[in-house]
Amino acid sequence: SMKTVVLKFGGTSVGSIERIKKVCKIISSYKKKKNKVVVISSAMSGVTNELVNKSKLISNNFDKAEYDTLLSTGEQVSCALIAGRLNHIGFKSRSWLSWQIPIITEGPHSAARINRVVSKELQNYLKTGGIPVITGFQGINSNYRLTTIGRSGSDATAIMLAKFIKADECIIYTDVDGVYTTDPRQYKNAKKIKKIFYDEMLEMASLGSKVMQPTSVQDAKLNKIDIQVKSSFVSKPGTLITNSSKVFSDQIITGISSTKNDAKITIEGVKDRPGVAASIFKPLSQNLINVDMVVQNISLNGKETDLTFTIKSDDLKKAEKFIKQNKKISYKKLSFDKD
């Protein structure tokens, strides 16, 4: 049977005409596999900032509704270019602006939430084999004014569309090829995580994982949408963010290398429950101990987890004390590895 796939492309993925052509190749590869394909695009990188600057030159107290009207033009440009390119390379495609679907939002300008997506026309268009290219980051409110969804609004758009059209897959293309234990742009020994639960992802996001905003992960969790995070720059497998434990039988990742200033701490046999990682890391961060890389291996029985993370060597004694004092966690073994 036909799969429905939602593909979302971030600003750097559509940041130039060359990149847009590359993105259209990616889109066409999904379409050739006989999928129904829905595309969500952000504005070309840099464009939104230019628009923000223009508004500041007009007034440092720029009208909020006009601000959203101004900003929403960014995605209109990228979606028209993508749809135009798809047509050029032989695929039926058209752009859909948020108000044409419509995507209905509630809440204040610049921080609206998507309430519902009226998807009937869109579904009909998908049945004809067309590829809709939809503006991320925006919608219309009950007064028919354009609204924007705040940070990472395009992810929210993708997740809500996936929900309302009952998509089989939601794939978020970005400039990193998945979720890493720490920012791969800063640490070359960051490890990619193949599969991660929403709850762990929420903890990772607060640990500075730049891949997805916590609100988007929360949306995905609430609506039970599995998300694949991939890079549009390299064709490598990404990270699956999911809630189904069936995918967890294979061990996620094993081992992180500790560097000369880092110490590695492994806590084995931690009783696995939602938020367990947070209850370990919170006291550490409150005491200014920076947790750098986190690796979690769920045990085969699914009830326990092994947690490995790195901290600065100087913090080792302090960290050990906080873990041992922590009444919220039970574990079997605590070990340290210092280079």
Where are these regions (language model features)?
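Structural preference for solvent-exposed beta-strand-turn elements
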Residues: 161, 167, 219-225, 229, ...
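Short hydrophobic alpha-helical runs that function as membrane-insertion/retention elements
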Residues: 169-173, 227-229, 292
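Electropositive, surface-exposed helix/loop patches at the edges of structured domains
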Residues: 126-141, 204-228, 263-265, 269-273, ...
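Acidic, glycine-rich loop-and-beta core segments that form the ion-binding/anion-interacting portion
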Residues: 186-191, 196, 206, 216, ...
